[in-house]
Regions:
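Post-signal-peptide, soluble extracytosolic/periplasmic N-terminal scaffold domains
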Residues: 1, 7-14, 20-22
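Structural signature of WD-repeat beta-propellers
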Residues: 6, 13-14, 52-53, 97-98, ...
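Extracytoplasmic beta-rich repeat domains
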Residues: 1-3, 28-44, 67-90, 115-140, ...
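Tandem repeat domain/solenoid detector
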Residues: 55-56, 66
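Short loop/turn segments that connect beta-strands within beta-propeller blades
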Residues: 22-26, 61-65, 106-110, 157-160
Length: 181
């Protein structure tokens, strides 16, 4: 997909290549990433944050495309092919992954701050065990919320990842927080 940030336009393609172009469409840099880019990358504090279909999250230098860090985790044999974006707040990237995993990762270093499971995979077949987080996590005050396909919705504290509340509600579309004051 095409995405923009600052004065650059960038293109992610299915073959795992990411390119940066100037506003006058001159190539600035191109780089290989670990897999197919299925969502819009984000640019924060000079770092391009990109998710790939193989369950990895990469931080790239916005000026030259060089990889600064890589967060990776295993991917089950069967997943939902909807790859959620990430939410970024207070120098932390919040991302939902396959098998119901929600992770908080340092924007500057890629080091895991905390990880938790929103919904445990369960069932007797691979299809029944799909519990992927299929939408971007939602931030609200000091909590991050995520919902899993065939699973549950849950909210956690931003800082430590402590469970604040959860309900057995499944979704493949995501969640919205609405304050009814």
């Amino acid at each position: 997909g095409v995405w923009a940030g600052g004065v650059f336009g960038r293109v992610g393609c299915g073959q795992g290549q990411l390119s940066a172009f100037s506003c006058d469409v001159k190539l600035i840099w191109k780089t290989k990433v670990s897999g197919e880019v299925l969502n819009i990358a984000k640019i924060v504090e000079g770092i391009v944050v990109v998710r790939t279909a193989d369950g990895r999250l990469s931080g790239l230098d916005v000026t030259d495309g060089k990889r600064l860090w890589l967060y990776e985790q295993s991917v089950p044999a069967l997943i939902v092919r909807i790859h959620a974006g990430v939410a970024i707040e207070r120098g932390t990237i919040f991302g939902g992954f396959a098998a119901g995993k929600l992770a908080a990762v340092s924007l500057s270093t890629g080091i895991v701050i905390w990880e938790t499971i929103v919904s445990q995979p369960r069932g007797s077949t691979e299809l029944e065990r799909i519990s992927d987080i299929t939408s971007s996590p939602v931030l609200d005050d000091d909590q991050v919320c995520a919902v899993a396909f065939q699973g549950r919705i849950a909210c956690y504290s931003l800082a430590q990842g402590n469970l604040l509340w959860s309900r057995d509600i499944s979704s493949d579309k995501g969640i919205t927080i609405f304050h009814n004051y």
